[in-house]
């Protein structure tokens, strides 16, 4: 039933999907064991991208439209006069502007707070691993998600990339480190990573024979209601949020950009875009203890069927 609901959402979005037999799935991923699968939902257009390649594609297109980029130029402060954004201060200059978009990831909380906005943007730890190269792992193998095991996997060239959503998430409190500092260093948690491999074992027996090559980790930000924080703040004219992306910052970036533009340029944005406004937290009382717990819950149940 849950997969049928997923298919209905995909159909509504115009994505081609179909249920396929286990044998057909086995043919697409020969190293995997689909014998116990009760349903396999196939999306031919699914895939993945490299964040750096996507970023450079955005940059190239933006430059063609007249945008300018100042790389290696940190913004030190946002200038505000009489409730309006008037510019930003960099290491070398002051740039006058009427609009600032806060798209700073794990530091989105700090940038918002610097202009007087308190928003529940919670960094939550996420890890994945890449194995050594192995026979049978080819770059064109499909991306696989196993909701019951809260795992995702794909080929990384001729290696295996596997990550998952921890059942007991670890978050950081952004109030504990300043804007000028990096978020806390994450050491690889081999107990968690080993749990991913153990969960994957029945579906991909070969995983237990593959050596570990590298571990990747970071702090994607989550919100207490599991929705983006997008759009202008009524408390400060010209300050626009694009944060709290709930681990969709890269994959959802084009849609997030479209929502940001709609929130800024449309007289009457859609109900959905209005529902993402940062004002929803200003209007409703919240506290950090509850916000962290709720944000972690959305991380922990990221793949939960029936959630």
Predicted regions and their residues:
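C-terminal lid/capping helical subdomain adjacent to the catalytic/cofactor pocket in oxidative enzymes
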Residues: 19, 24, 234-307
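Active-site lid/adjacent beta-loop-alpha segment flanking the redox-cofactor pocket in flavoenzymes
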Residues: 135-238
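A short, glycine/Asx- and small/polar-enriched loop/turn
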Residues: 2, 29-37, 79-86, 222-226, ...
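Short loop/edge segments at beta-strand edges and connector loops
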Residues: 21, 71-73, 214
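Mid-domain beta-loop-alpha active-site segment that forms a flexible
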Residues: 40-61, 105-107, 188-199, 245, ...
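Central helical "cap/lid" subdomain
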Residues: 93-142, 158
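Helical element adjacent to the flavin cofactor pocket in flavoenzyme catalytic cores
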Residues: 41-99, 107
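Dinucleotide-binding Rossmann-like beta1-alpha1 core, especially the glycine-rich loop
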Residues: 1-28, 150-153
């Amino acid at each position: 039933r849950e997969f049928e609901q997923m298919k209905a959402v995909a159909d509504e979005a115009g994505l081609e999907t179909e249920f396929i037999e286990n044998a057909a799935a086995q043919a697409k991923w020969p190293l995997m064991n689909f014998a116990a699968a009760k349903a396999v939902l196939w999306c031919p257009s699914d895939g993945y991208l490299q964040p750096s390649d996507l970023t450079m594609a955005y940059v190239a297109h933006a430059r063609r439209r007249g945008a300018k980029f100042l790389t290696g130029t940190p913004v030190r402060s946002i200038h505000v006069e009489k409730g309006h954004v008037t510019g930003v201060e960099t290491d070398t200059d002051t740039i006058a502007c009427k609009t600032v978009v806060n798209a700073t990831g794990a530091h989105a909380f700090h940038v918002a707070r610097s202009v007087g906005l308190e928003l529940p943007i919670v960094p939550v730890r996420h890890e994945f691993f890449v194995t050594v190269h192995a026979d049978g792992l080819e770059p064109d193998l499909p991306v696989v998600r196993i909701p019951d095991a809260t795992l995702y996997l794909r080929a990384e060239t001729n290696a295996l990339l596997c990550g998952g959503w921890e059942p007991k998430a670890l978050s950081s409190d952004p109030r504990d480190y300043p804007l000028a500092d990096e978020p806390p260093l994450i050491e690889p948690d081999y107990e968690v990573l080993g749990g991913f491999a153990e969960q994957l074992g029945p579906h991909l027996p070969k995983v237990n024979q593959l050596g570990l090559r590298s571990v990747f980790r970071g702090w994607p930000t989550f919100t207490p209601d599991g929705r983006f924080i997008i759009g202008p703040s009524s408390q400060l004219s010209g300050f626009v949020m694009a944060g709290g992306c709930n681990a969709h910052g890269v994959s959802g970036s084009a849609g997030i950009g479209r929502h940001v533009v709609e929130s800024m340029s449309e007289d009457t944005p859609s109900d959905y875009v209005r529902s993402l406004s940062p004002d929803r937290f200003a209007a409703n009382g919240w506290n950090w203890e509850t916000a962290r717990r709720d944000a972690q819950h959305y991380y922990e149940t990221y793949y939960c069927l029936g959630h």
